[in-house]
Amino acid sequence: MTIAFSNFYKDNILDGLKKIITSEFNKMPIYNDYPFINRGGTMFLNIQIVDDIDEEIFTSGALRQISVSIRLYQKLEGVQDFNKNKSIQNRYAERMRSLIEENSNYKVSNTPQWINGSVVDIDYEPDLNEDENNYMACELSCEFMTMQTFTIQA
């Protein structure tokens, strides 16, 4: 007997976040790069799983709390009006917060992908590493509860 695992990070969390965000921001590229890769776009998102905690373990799976970082990058090119660009970026971040909170219990085909999804913090001035210096960024810290099921194959 073997236990089969699925990529529940992608299936339950990342795919849902991408679908929700692209429903509103359909032209914004979304990546899952670690470490950061300079993509050259004017504005893009980078979504990373930053923590995973087993909340409760069952014989058929585990209830897990997944922490996710969503960084919104805006490239700084030429003479920029910092306040105008920061205002645009902040509006995008607040709209993403609303989208996640409107979908706090997210289902696909009546199957729960996550429950109690929320944005716990927005950092409008996150620390940037050297590769990110040509960008203005803000970071949404999110948490989701999801069920990872174990499938036993004979």
Language-model segments: what does each one mean?
Residues M1-F36, D51-A154:
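Charged, amphipathic alpha-helical segments and their flanking helix caps
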Residues G41-D52:
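A short, hydrophobic beta-strand-centered structural micro-motif
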